[in-house]
Amino acid sequence: MITLKGLRKEFAGTTALDGIDLHVESGLIHGIVGRSGAGKSTLIRCLTGLETPTSGTVVINGEDVTAYTGARLRKARRSIGMVFQHAELLDSKTALENIAHPLVIAGVKKKQAMQRARELITLVGLEGREDNHPAQLSGGQRQRVGIARALATEPKILLCDEPTSALDSTTTAQILALIKQLRDDLGITVLIITHEMSVVREICDSVTLLAEGRNQHTASLREVLSDPASTLARELIPLPSAPIRDAEDATVMLEISIAGLSAAEVFDAAQRAGTPIVEVEAATLERIAGLDVGRMRIRSTDAQATRALGRTLTERGIHVEEAA
């Protein structure tokens, strides 16, 4: 369990985190998203004790670790496993030795550390690669070693900082599936820092949007998607830009956000309203978190009927905007 209360961090008069409140229940996969400069990196450093907050508290598994130093801080850090964008493995060591390394540093006997590393090699699907050095491994395999290394101390929390942004789409899907499986098998809490909304759509149970050091929105993925007109939902379900239209084009364009119903129901409503849809200019429709969600942009020549359709859809709880 992770709880942040009023977390604030300033650097030479610049506010990186501005009073963040956040609670993540145990066993969830929670995404932290935001553009560059939103405060994601500073948040990570405060969570891991690499930065001391200017004010506020960080509670990890019931312990306020904000003021911890020395041995108490090192012990608290062992409850958090870190997975980075690049695994940063030691080139001189084998995959097995890289996984065992944090245990050896922590004072665990080498025989015990290597036994734990062998268990983790199997857990992350790298049997047969134990004696390979990093240069002999693919990017996805190196990331699996990094994940295994993060789990060496049996942490309760796995903190993943852009874990797939350096990988191709196929390998990304495999690594995300592995993280989800590890959560299911080990019961750990996973915090994923990412700018890739596809990662959130794929495996997150809940998500937080950071902007200018503030928590702009936190909710379960299903709650976010049930409000498809929200800022976060628009990020998760983007539409392509509208094509440039002729100044004399008299068609009316509606942007429709869908949650919990199909595109066919929208077209059925249009037909009953007598609205001649000229063109579907763009559409994004998919099933996420067990919910059919999407957005579409339609164009029609009948302004009056189109606006009547918009009102009908709005009455049914569907968000509709007239696009410029």
Give residue spans per PLM region:
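Conserved signature/switch motifs of ABC ATPase nucleotide-binding domains
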Residues: 132-135, 152-153
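Helix-to-loop junction immediately C-terminal to a conserved catalytic motif
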Residues: 48
